[in-house]
């Protein structure tokens, strides 16, 4: 009689154990999925920056980046930019050395004469260093688009130039997030631009 009761007791314990285990796993699953999905949503939340004067929009991550615009006076580059927008990491943007820290993405706008082809303009501006790989880029509203890649060089080693009748837009990503922001760049249709003051 004792063997039977012992077997019965064992099977009872197995049953109870099994029930507890299955309850535990469902609780764990519910908890797991809710914690997994929430942080992803927060980091991916992007805001759109729209520049009506120069006719473009770009999405960025406001939690991580701050948008800084340089006045044309500050942009002592050749050729000289009429507008420059930098997306700087927030932890770097507060310091004194903000101008020396690379941004996530830099967008520069240059005026262009429409009769010149984009690659001629890049060449004459010294923006195609030796060893550059050049490929074409397509985007709505863009007449010509070129990507200049320098594989031998550390970042920034990718430069995207997009041209319409009035401007050349230069986009330079410095990191992976900058690359994502670059891919969100769009030109505004003519109707939604502010009319240029000449």
Language model feature labels by segment:
Residues 24-26:
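Bacterial signal peptide processing site
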Residues 31-81, 140, 198:
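N-terminal "mature-domain start" segment
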Residues 178-198:
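Short, low-complexity, Pro/Ser/Thr/Gly-rich segments in the mature regions of secreted, periplasmic
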């Amino acid at each position: 009689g004792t063997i039977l009761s012992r077997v019965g007791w064992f099977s009872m314990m197995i049953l109870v154990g099994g029930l507890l285990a299955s309850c535990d796993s469902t609780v764990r699953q519910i908890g797991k999925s809710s914690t997994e999905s929430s942080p992803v949503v927060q980091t991916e939340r992007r805001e759109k920056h729209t520049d009506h004067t120069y006719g473009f929009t770009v999405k960025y991550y406001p939690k991580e980046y701050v948008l800084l615009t340089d006045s044309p006076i500050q942009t002592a580059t050749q050729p000289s930019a009429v507008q420059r927008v930098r997306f700087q990491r927030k932890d770097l943007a507060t310091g004194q050395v903000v101008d020396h820290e690379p941004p996530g993405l830099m967008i520069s706008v240059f005026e262009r004469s429409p009769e010149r082809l984009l690659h001629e303009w890049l060449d004459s501006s010294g923006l195609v260093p030796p060893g550059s790989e050049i490929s074409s880029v397509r985007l709505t509203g863009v007449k010509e688009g070129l990507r200049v890649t320098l594989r031998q060089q550390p970042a920034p080693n990718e430069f995207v130039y997009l041209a319409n009748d009035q401007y050349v837009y230069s986009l330079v990503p410095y990191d992976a997030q900058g690359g994502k922001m670059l891919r969100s760049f769009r030109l505004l249709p003519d109707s939604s631009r502010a009319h240029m003051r000449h």
